[in-house]
């Protein structure tokens, strides 16, 4: 009975995968960092419920919009990446299409795939996924120093060199600069969306930890405490330097803006 059930599932699954599909991701909200691409039926524009969920049919169209980066994952490994807006055709023999390259060849390939699926309970032996990454600036991230942060005030003209304690509150922005690093080290395979709140606390904690050395860098530039609000760009650059090892080299994130609402 198990073989009969597997055979029935395999036939339905393989034939469902033969319809050419397209993958498209509409504009993502600012709180969405990663979204799994959904398979749409090429004929009706509806989600294809007949094919295997994690199979990309040969000849399928993949659309990449502005502010997005797309990666294709096959068996857990990244096999393609595209950050250029446009429509692309998926061209590989991993899952041959009945409607591409002649009915006979496609049917024969489907049959070979059908035989392989018996050992997987009617599910394709391949696991292919498309992920879309939001590469726009993620803005409006709030921060605030719970405890005062030391700030060194140096003025060589008058021989001043003292430490004061300051608090600051505001918002910052960041951007996914390397989606491959973000996928490998942060999000991995996700079923639907990977949202900002899942990493927000970690980023805020690291940002607040980096504030002290960043303040140290701008104080060395001779910037006074009262003028810090006029040098937020310099502070953002200093924060990027401090956070480059964790955010840049590990997370694939670049710090883009730092705003101070009160100091």
Predicted regions and their residues:
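N-terminal hydrophobic membrane-entry segments
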Residues: 1-263
